[in-house]
Amino acid sequence: MGSLSPLEPLFTPLRIGAFALQHRVVQAPCTRMRSTKESDGIWVPNDLNVEYYAQRASKGGLMLSEATPISRDAAGYPGVPGIFTPSQIEGWRKVTNAVHTKGGLILCQLWHVGRATTPGFLGGKTPLAPSDIPISGKALDGNVYADAPPRPMTVDEIKEVVLEYAAASKRAIEAGFDGVEIHGGNGYLLDQFLHDNVNNRTDAYGGSIENRSRIVLEIISAVTEAIGAERVGIRLSPYNYFQDTRDSNPQKHWGYLCTQIASLPESSRPAYVHMIEPRFDEILDESEKISALETMQEVVKPSLDGLRSSLKKGGVSFIAAGNFKPENAGEKLITDSADAIAFGRLFISNPDLPRRLKEGIELTKYDRSTFYGATPPEKGYTDYPFAQ
């Protein structure tokens, strides 16, 4: 790829598992909170959601759905459609049909929020997590997380969640999705098991990284068995400290996990791993940021290249995400640091993003205030313009 111009690598074909892509501009999963409430804790994809995904679909392009709760007990946000009721499956089928009509591919991102919820979202139930450590601050419903600390999951409950992921993957295929992405990052349930500062278990699912990785590997095996490894990916975020997660040694610990993923039998090995790039403002705590700024010292940002290399040995593709722009996206591919690039915010405000990037058309700026719901719901959702 070294002889190509900066953006050309984004528009070369790529095969990831079962998916033959015509370009490498992937739509990242973006929670938008615009689905219809059917009953307490249950939101269903609606016609506006169909329009949103259809707008952003492209021939041979890969889309990742917004994070989608696998069960009633997995939810923690309003307006987010799940994949656990017949009406949700039917609603998603309209979305996937619309994407396929435009020649696109779409995967369902399977989600369990773990402790990132409150009883108000769970019909009064106590949130489940690896340990009884609550998130600091308030939830979206205004309740303080610490007022209802999570209950540590029993081993039987962990096994049940593994089965729920597998069952949800089958429902996703029933709804017309081309495959699934397991959400293993951003401080949600699987990430809570992985980070040693919020997992203080002393059984087979806590302590060593071998134990903390166990549920992730079990879910990968269960989901790949359910729908086929070539239709499965997983998202991880070792350096992005969402919701109080902060591991003591991400490079070592996620290095172990990636080596294990790459070493899985072919029938259980996911087609890709999707990772979020480290950011300066997230990898340092507040005192470290102040020290670095006061002394003007150079901060060496951790790299995902070692993790990418481990996965590549097993033939596992790598999708990179995290504040990519036209200026730096192609370079990531030219240096073989990733196979494809996932764009989130730019896809929100540019429904025709692949075309704009390919033709050098000016990008529309996004409005952060409309990311998570708006009045009317079309605002900042389906009203961004296409290029002329």
Swiss-Prot record:
InterPro entries: Aldolase_TIM, OxRdtase_FMN_N, Oye-like. It holds the Pfam family Oxidored_FMN. Transmembrane segments: none annotated. Induction: Expression is induced by nicotinate and 6-OH nicotinate, subject to nitrogen metabolite repression mediated by the GATA factor areA, and strictly regulated by the cluster-specific transcription regulator hnxR. Keywords: Oxidoreductase. GO terms for molecular function: FMN binding; NADPH dehydrogenase activity. The keyword Oxidoreductase applies. Its cofactor is FMN. Its EC number is 1.-.-.-. Flavin oxidoreductase, part of the hnx cluster involved in the purine degradation. The nicotinate hydroxylase hnxS accepts nicotinate as a substrate and catalyzes the first step of nicotinate catabolism. The major facilitator-type transporters hxnP and hxnZ are probably involved in the uptake of nicotinate-derived metabolites, and the oxidoreductases hxnT and hxnY in the further metabolism of 6-OH nicotinic acid. Belongs to the NADH:flavin oxidoreductase/NADH oxidase family. This is Flavin oxidoreductase hxnT. It comes from Emericella nidulans (strain FGSC A4 / ATCC 38163 / CBS 112.46 / NRRL 194 / M139) (Aspergillus nidulans). The gene is hxnT.
